[in-house]
Amino acid sequence: MNILNLKIIMFLLISNTIVVGGAWATSTCPDWPATRIAVEINALEQQLNKWSAAYHQQGHSPVTDDIYDQLQDKLRVWQSCRGLPDKTESQPIPGKGQFLHPVAHTGLKKLKDETALTRWMAGRKNLWVQPKVDGVAVTLVYHGGKLVQLLSRGNGVKGQNWTEKAPFISAIPQYIANAPALLTLQGELFLLMDGHQQAKSGGVNARSTVAGALMRKSPSPLLAQVGVFIWAWPDGPTTMKEKVALLQVMGFPFTAKYSEPVMSHLDVVQWRQFWFQAPLPFVTDGVVVRQEEEPAGRYWQATPGQWSMAWKYPPLQHIAEVKDIHFTLGRTGKGTVVLEVLPIKIDDKWIRRVNIGSVTRWKQWDIAPGDHITLALAGHGIPRLDNVVWRVHQRNTITAPNWDKFHQLSCFQRLPHGCEPQFLSRLIWLSGPGGLDIGGIGGGFWQELIHHELINDLVGWLLLTPEQIASIPGIGNARAEKIYQQFQRAKQQPFSRWLLALGFPQVVSVDAQWQVVLRRSLSEWATMAGIGQMRAKQIKHFWDHPDVQALADFLSTQKVVGFELTE
């Protein structure tokens, strides 16, 4: 057995197991030389910077926040593997704005989980939680109560001037009576929604919709559907209670309605879950926890501050890193490609492998080890490849095996050379629920029989004695006797199940006999309901194949139901 076949067989065996433990291996350092990891860090860092620039300059990004955040986490891991400092939070925000903000936009650090939240809250007091509204960050500047500037966030220091769009956004007061002589507010322009439930509907592209309306040269009718959520009042009142009350009086009601005091991390957990499921007038992607005490505005910088933190909702899209690529040969001779990924948990299910279909499909995806893909769970919890979101810079060439000689009627026996993978797949199917459904008999057992040369064809196991079965390492006499009895009882399985177990391409009635079915002509098969000419030819080829005839003759000698000779 060559190395390729051994690799295929061993992977086929483990792919039939269920993952019941483990952890998402995001903290694993890649097994790369120092020169390569340096190249990969640089490439990923540049890509993240491009996406960040698109987000802050254009209001949207080619990737979702979920994808960006997870790839940013991956960059941190790679940097730590080389002993490099984490620069992701302190790196200046890219942007090309020309208008200076009176007070810089600080941005938010992201808390990874409840443990990180608890750690950050420890020792802090006067904390409040708000929904993290998913919109376009802006600065509002009022002089003597009159709105004089509406600036985009830009790079946090300078932004674009959108003041001419402000009169078309009814949610923004154009004049505030009794306002401070100089009033600077920071907040989020968002698309007004009618009872939006984040848990059910997700982001619905709301932020990009608002950004597009703001960036148009002429005013868009959509601006009338834009709301504003004020989340920062630099150099404003010292208490949050006073801030939200005054904001409401000035014409910004959402901040008061959606700001809640919290005493412990459990309060934050409760509000986060509530807002995730409750009908809201805006799209959200998490919550923000902030403390009342904050520095004077002149000390704010365009990097995340320490007085507020974001705790985002669980990602809607899950990234997995491709660890290896395996090629498996199924019982019908069709090859499939299975991606082995670093373990990832989706909806309480651990994912380690993803079947992506044919070799042709794999080539179309252009996936190599080290690439990062997005996964989702399809029907019955089966993982599905959605997209490739990041390709490693150095791509190792992988050559798929040549399976041209394999087909639906090949490898009913262990030999000739190269048949082991398909032969093993046939045995797994035979003992599985689609075949004879022999409990406790799977790929591992069949591989042991093949390895010890105790089986050479698809039904040779019927000749095994308890002593031969017990000779397999790890199988004692008691279990060997149980397996032997299971094999003997399999002889009484219905004829139709035996045909399915052998690979017959059509279900037949339970009371049929081999010799009766064998006498049917091609035209008789073709006229049967649900078969047709093409399926009839497949059936005829199956009956006429010498290996199938040999299997039937053997089953006849074993007095298997339906295969007995009749007078």
Curated annotation (Swiss-Prot):
GO terms for biological process: DNA repair; DNA replication. The keyword NAD applies. The keyword Cytoplasm does not apply. Its EC number is 6.5.1.2. It catalyses: NAD(+) + (deoxyribonucleotide)n-3'-hydroxyl + 5'-phospho-(deoxyribonucleotide)m = (deoxyribonucleotide)n+m + AMP + beta-nicotinamide D-nucleotide. Coiled coil: none annotated. It is an enzyme of class 6 (ligase). InterPro entries: DNA_ligase_B, DNAligase_adenylation, DNAligase_N, NA-bd_OB-fold, NAD_dep_DNA_ligaseB, NAD_DNA_ligase_OB, RuvA_2-like. Keywords: DNA damage, DNA repair, DNA replication, Ligase, NAD. One of its GO terms (molecular function) is DNA ligase (NAD+) activity. The active site is at K132 (n6-amp-lysine intermediate). Belongs to the NAD-dependent DNA ligase family. LigB subfamily. Catalyzes the formation of phosphodiester linkages between 5'-phosphoryl and 3'-hydroxyl groups in double-stranded DNA using NAD as a coenzyme and as the energy source for the reaction. This is DNA ligase B. The lineage of its organism: Bacteria, Pseudomonadati, Pseudomonadota, Gammaproteobacteria, Enterobacterales. The gene is ligB.
